[in-house]
């Protein structure tokens, strides 16, 4: 399977192989491409182009990508801002199968096809870097594995650990906090990596797991058990 990636950010990219492209290290397209590179055994990643947030440029970029590839990954352009055109263009050129997720971070996420029933699958990832990574790991990665013939695709296992501190959460959505799993007093414990903003890459760089809080879950007190998804085998 071939996959390609486009970005709606105004960042300079050298076209060519993954090894030859350049991009600012704090931008989400770099992180998404690194995760695609981890799947090189099943997909050939191609950086198509960086598209500025201009409506006139997005349709041609997606048409070009869909013509020669099976899967398209985009970063940004799927929220509700004035420059978020990707979802509308998807609807014009194909089908939007779903949009918006009850999760944090990663709520702006579009999935569909460009070019009808036999067209390329499109994963419209969020624009903020941490949200891009979480959406890729939770949705795009297992889908790419399935498209490559892996069946079944086992979901990442969830482990139980005690939260070392209090975590504030409102019900209604699944939240993925970046955390550090460690052993203390004969038990597995987990702590958050600190500030959890979707643009704070250090929250991922310092983590070894996700703390997964389900949609019905509310705030967590210190010592309370929580579900943990390890980065090992995922990231």
Language-model-derived ranges and their functions:
Residues 1, 13:
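Phosphate-interaction motifs
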Residues 25:
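Nucleic-acid processing machinery
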Residues 32-125, 129-134:
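Helix-rich terminal scaffold detector
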Residues 91-235:
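Flexible glycine/proline-rich
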């Amino acid at each position: 399977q071939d996959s390609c990636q486009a970005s709606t950010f105004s960042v300079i990219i050298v076209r060519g192989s993954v090894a030859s492209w350049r991009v600012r290290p704090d931008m989400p397209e770099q992180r998404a491409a690194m995760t695609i590179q981890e799947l090189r055994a099943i997909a050939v990643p191609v950086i198509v182009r960086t598209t500025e947030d201009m409506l006139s440029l997005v349709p041609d970029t997606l048409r070009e990508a869909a013509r020669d590839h099976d899967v398209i990954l985009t970063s940004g352009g799927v929220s509700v801002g004035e420059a978020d055109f990707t979802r509308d263009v998807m609807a014009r050129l194909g089908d939007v199968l779903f949009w918006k997720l009850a999760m944090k971070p990663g709520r702006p996420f579009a999935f569909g096809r460009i070019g009808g029933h036999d067209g390329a699958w499109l994963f419209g990832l969020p624009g903020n870097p941490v949200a891009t990574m979480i959406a890729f790991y939770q949705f795009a990665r297992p889908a790419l594995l399935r498209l490559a013939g892996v069946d079944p695709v086992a979901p990442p296992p969830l482990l139980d650990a005690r939260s070392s501190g209090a975590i504030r959460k409102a019900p209604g959505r699944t939240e993925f906090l970046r955390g550090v799993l460690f052993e203390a007093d004969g038990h597995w414990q987990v702590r958050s990596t600190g500030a959890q903003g979707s643009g704070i890459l250090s929250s991922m760089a310092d983590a070894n797991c996700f703390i997964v809080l389900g949609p019905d879950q509310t705030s967590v007190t210190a010592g309370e058990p929580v579900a943990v998804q390890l980065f090992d085998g995922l990231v």
